[in-house]
């Protein structure tokens, strides 16, 4: 039996490997995988090279096109804790003829050809009482069965927090996007009801949106609900003049 002071022949015995001929197995496998991934990544990038000629906006709301805002309504709602309240149910108050007519006349001149690229539902939320400290919550569904009647109040289940500007924005564009209708002013003038159904809801989703707060008390909030139209404009056809000045 060896003590701490006795001699142990195995102490100090070492094995020296020449690193020139021996390599760590894990390092070899990792290096091979790294090379394989690099080759695959290069091939994938080459297939995407033709797309370098195009520009896209990270946020479609800030992309090319003109934003035209249509304020649908402003209301004060009381929201109880742990619940969310339905904001928009498209029952009719969102489609007041006077509001839409004024918007169409101001935003869509008769002489211009314009196309709706996207429609955003924008909900701005503000507390009505001062010195309240809570965050706004929101939840939405883009589509549902036509016969579905949404509940006015639901319990909070996996909502998303609204941003620092207290604005909740939802893009309503269907896959493919865009609204292939030119000269929207004349389309609207022909028939208001047909314009809403055939132009708006034929090309864009009709969403259901709920809002709430993370407060433990009942809160009173001011809601401003609006639709923002992303417009693509085309220059009108200029007539050709023949005369001494030209």
Swiss-Prot record:
MF terms (GO), sorted A to Z: structural molecule activity
GO cellular component, one term: viral occlusion body
Domain of life: Viruses
Keywords: Viral occlusion body
Family: Belongs to the polyhedrin family.
Described function: Major component of the virus occlusion bodies, which are large proteinaceous structures (polyhedra), that protect the virus from the outside environment for extended periods until they are ingested by insect larvae.
UniProt-recorded name of the protein: Polyhedrin
Naturally occurring in which organism (per UniProt): Panolis flammea multiple nucleocapsid polyhedrosis virus (PfMNPV)
Organism placement in taxonomy: Viruses, Viruses incertae sedis, Naldaviricetes, Lefavirales, Baculoviridae
